[in-house]
Amino acid sequence: MISRNSILLRRLYPTTIIRTLATDATESTSVKTKRRRTIFTDELNKGPSFDDFVSGKAKDMLEDPLETARKDPNAKLPSWLKVPIPKGKSFHNVKKDVRELKLATVCEEAKCPNIGECWGGKKSEATATIMLLGDTCTRGCRFCSVKTNRKPAAPDPMEPENTAEAISRWGLGYVVLTTVDRDDLVDGGARHLAETVQKIKQKAPQILVEVLGGDFRGDLSMVEILADSGLDVYAHNLETVEALTPHIRDRRATYRQSLAVLERAKQTNSSLITKTSLMLGFGETDDQVLQTLRDLREIGCDVVTFGQYMRPTKRHMKVVEYIKPEKFDYWRDTALDMGFLYVASGPLVRSSYKAGEAFIENVLKKRKHNVGETPRLAQEIKPSIY
């Protein structure tokens, strides 16, 4: 059926004109579509190819959005959070070793802003925090960019050996091992971690080992296995204050459970240094942070670090506040006055940040040689962490 509008149009204009108008409209749409497709294709061609994804090179070609923000003078990221782009021979050597031995690092998986500094130092200073038990976590904390899955792949049985081999190559004096949570494993991965520590000590007994472990679903017998493995520093992160824990961490992680982990580690091996980390910028109050420090001192925690929460992607929690460097100085001084052995506090500090390793390494060496009491941080070293 011909519409009334069509009949009116034909009466007013000759057929040839209508056809011309229709042709022009079609051509115009075609040009716009072609232009859009051309722009899209051009942008696509700038990125990695299919072969790059297959070979694993694509990850190195894609730029981190956080890095883009640091280079953008109009970005909202405060100036004190901007760091140089990672580069240098040492950086690429560490990266090469990590790839060859098929190891995961929290430096890459968690998009740590200090990767250039930690990987790019001199051989005796360069370090990578190795992430054990794979690169996929069974939990989903709202601040973390590590991949999640209810049933990750089985742990690599060669991982302890490969990790020990990589660390012995780097010639380090101090190394940090961390892990994803593995709630799918009966022991939470505790025995795998303990084996890794033992392998490292066999290959290089002089290396001091810090392990940043999980809570093993509250099974403190697993904490005991790890604490007795030969490690030197037992770390487990509270992440935030008690009131915000249910909103920030996975529901299976609780504030009191984390305190119990740190307490049991110290009870199992009193010579261990126990360590935890807090992120600021979630909206916590000063009173809440102060109470957290009291709770940590009550269970004998030796070391605490403070860092700025930085949103990894738009899917994660928003930053409530960018804490100024002066406030981090305040928390460092406050924690030291409360009796903590060592405190690292600054916007870019992370739980495995290397600025603290020099001091902790010195403490452990003095303990092993029974050289009197170890002075506190303010008297020992003053690392630059900004």
From Swiss-Prot:
Reaction catalysis annotation: [[Fe-S] cluster scaffold protein carrying a second [4Fe-4S](2+) cluster] + N(6)-octanoyl-L-lysyl-[protein] + 2 oxidized [2Fe-2S]-[ferredoxin] + 2 S-adenosyl-L-methionine + 4 H(+) = [[Fe-S] cluster scaffold protein] + N(6)-[(R)-dihydrolipoyl]-L-lysyl-[protein] + 4 Fe(3+) + 2 hydrogen sulfide + 2 5'-deoxyadenosine + 2 L-methionine + 2 reduced [2Fe-2S]-[ferredoxin]
One term under GO cellular component: mitochondrion
Subcellular locations according to the entry: Mitochondrion
SUPFAM superfamilies: Radical SAM enzymes
Disulfide links within the chain: none
GO BP field: lipoate biosynthetic process
Domain of life according to the entry: Eukaryota
InterPro entries in alphabetical order: Aldolase_TIM, Elp3/MiaA/NifB-like_rSAM, LIAS_N, Lipoyl_synth, rSAM
Pathway: Protein modification; protein lipoylation via endogenous pathway; protein N(6)-(lipoyl)lysine from octanoyl-[acyl-carrier-protein]: step 2/2
Keywords: 4Fe-4S, Iron, Iron-sulfur, Metal-binding, Mitochondrion, S-adenosyl-L-methionine, Transferase, Transit peptide
Cofactor(s) listed in the protein's UniProt record: [4Fe-4S] cluster
Transit peptide location on this chain: 1-21
Entry similarity comment: Belongs to the radical SAM superfamily. Lipoyl synthase family.
Protein name: Lipoyl synthase, mitochondrial
Organism encoding this protein: Candida albicans (strain SC5314 / ATCC MYA-2876)
Lineage: Eukaryota, Fungi, Dikarya, Ascomycota, Saccharomycotina
